[in-house]
């Protein structure tokens, strides 16, 4: 089996690329970073530090790389069985024209073996969005052929891969946590379902997308925002602060009650999942900075994201949300010199006041009880 993976950054090398290569798949990375491309093509291998209770070093081998903006990547799309991405939500639109060109070439070459494309991004139904961009870039006469022969498979991914400086200045070395989860929608594949260890197949992807968003992402963000307010440097420092831990755990339990109601998750299993996530935040090997995790507060306070979406669920089912409100209030206090969204948030609050600002960012009704609760909590933190 041959695969092409867009994005040779830390997540590409440390998570998806590693799973594909470990499964014995012939893997080529596509990227724009020439230093990384040259290193991959010179060595065809790299090291991954897997850290949890213990630390181990795995070697990923048999890989090579091409530029994501040249002809090589178009040629590969015409030949491979699987295309994956870990480029970040914004970049999906930029790689779509190259994918479209490759699909046209595949059609011209008469290659009708199934191709599946999986975007592995921190977003909901990212592959469906990528498909829209690809379809827009395709000529009309290729669209029906692509619909017939190419699967666009949505997925949910979860592995913490913080940026970390290599002790040896190796551009390929990467550190990842032990935990990883890659769940894909098995109803969207063309041809036989792949057997890749570490890839889980489901016919109810949205349940798992929301489980991750409402637990890992919600908890991570609230830990960061409360941690920053309390003067902590890392996620580990913050979650070991008992006051912060109580709010974070409480918020994940509140969002969890929504998931249990909505999708029928088992309550005991979900409680264990929350404990596992708290353990991940405590990982001493992951020097995850609260400022990095908290960045882009406007996006994180938007209606479909990790703070407001679970809050809306608690309103839908009439469930408690005190700790989620604390997290939202802390997010409104997030300030960072290096983050344009943090500066925009501060300016908006200074200009309109917290009530109107939160309503504008989140889509919540300015006169609602929850906005009033959040503003009260926000003022109590000043």
From Swiss-Prot:
Keywords from the named record: Acetylation, NAD, Oxidoreductase
Superkingdom to which the source organism belongs: Bacteria
GO cellular component, one term: cytosol
Keyword NAD among UniProt keywords: yes
SUPFAM superfamilies for this protein: 6-phosphogluconate dehydrogenase C-terminal domain-like, NAD(P)-binding Rossmann-fold domains
InterPro entries reported for this sequence: 6-PGluconate_DH-like_C_sf, 6PGD_dom2, Mannitol_1_phos_5_DH, Mannitol_DH, Mannitol_DH_C, Mannitol_DH_CS, Mannitol_DH_N, NAD(P)-bd_dom_sf
Pfam families the record matches: Mannitol_dh (PF01232), Mannitol_dh_C (PF08125)
E.C. code: 1.1.1.17
GO molecular function, one term: mannitol-1-phosphate 5-dehydrogenase activity
Binding site for NAD(+): 3-14
Catalytic activity: D-mannitol 1-phosphate + NAD(+) = beta-D-fructose 6-phosphate + NADH + H(+)
Modified residues (N6-acetyllysine): 269
A biological process term (GO) from this entry: mannitol catabolic process
Similarity comment: Belongs to the mannitol dehydrogenase family.
PANTHER family to which the protein is assigned, alphabetical: ALTRONATE OXIDOREDUCTASE-RELATED (PTHR30524:SF0), MANNITOL-1-PHOSPHATE 5-DEHYDROGENASE (PTHR30524)
Protein's recorded name: Mannitol-1-phosphate 5-dehydrogenase
């Amino acid at each position: 089996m041959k695969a092409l993976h867009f994005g040779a950054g830390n997540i590409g090398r440390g998570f998806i690329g590693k799973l594909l290569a470990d499964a014995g798949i012939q893997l080529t990375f596509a990227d724009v970073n020439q230093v990384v491309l040259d290193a991959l093509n010179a060595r065809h291998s790299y090291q991954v530090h897997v850290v949890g209770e213990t630390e181990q070093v795995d070697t990923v081998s048999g890989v090579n790389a091409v530029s994501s903006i040249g002809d090589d990547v178009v040629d590969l799309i015409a030949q491979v069985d699987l295309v994956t991405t870990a480029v970040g939500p914004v970049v999906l639109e930029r790689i779509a024209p190259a994918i479209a060109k490759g699909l046209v070439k595949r059609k011209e070459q008469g290659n009708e073996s199934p191709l599946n494309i999986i975007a592995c991004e921190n977003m909901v139904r990212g592959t469906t969005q990528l498909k829209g961009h690809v379809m827009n870039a395709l000529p009309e006469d290729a669209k029906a052929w692509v619909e017939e022969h190419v699967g666009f498979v949505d997925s949910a991914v979860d592995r913490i891969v913080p940026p970390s400086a290599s002790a040896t200045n190796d551009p390929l070395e990467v550190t990842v946590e032990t935990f990883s989860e890659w769940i894909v929608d098995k109803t969207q594949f063309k041809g036989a379902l792949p057997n890749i260890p570490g890839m889980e197949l489901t016919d109810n992807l949205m349940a798992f997308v929301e489980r991750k968003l409402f637990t890992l992402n919600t908890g991570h963000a609230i830990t960061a925002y409360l941690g920053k307010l309390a003067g902590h440097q890392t996620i580990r420092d913050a979650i070991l602060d008992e006051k912060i831990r109580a709010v974070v755990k409480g918020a994940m339990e509140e969002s969890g009650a929504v998931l249990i109601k909505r999708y029928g998750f088992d309550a005991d299993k979900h409680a264990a999942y929350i404990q596992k996530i708290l353990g991940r935040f405590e990982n001493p090997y992951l020097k995850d900075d609260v400022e990095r995790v908290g960045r882009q507060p406007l996006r994180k306070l938007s209606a479909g994201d990790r703070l407001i979406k679970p809050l809306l669920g608690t309103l839908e089912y009439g469930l408690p949300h005190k700790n989620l409100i604390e997290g939202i209030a802390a997010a409104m206090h997030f300030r960072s010199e290096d983050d344009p969204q943090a500066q925009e948030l501060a300016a908006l609050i200074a200009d309109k006041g917290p009530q109107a600002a939160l309503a504008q960012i989140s889509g919540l009704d300015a006169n609602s009880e929850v906005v009033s609760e959040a503003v009260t909590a926000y003022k109590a933190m000043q």
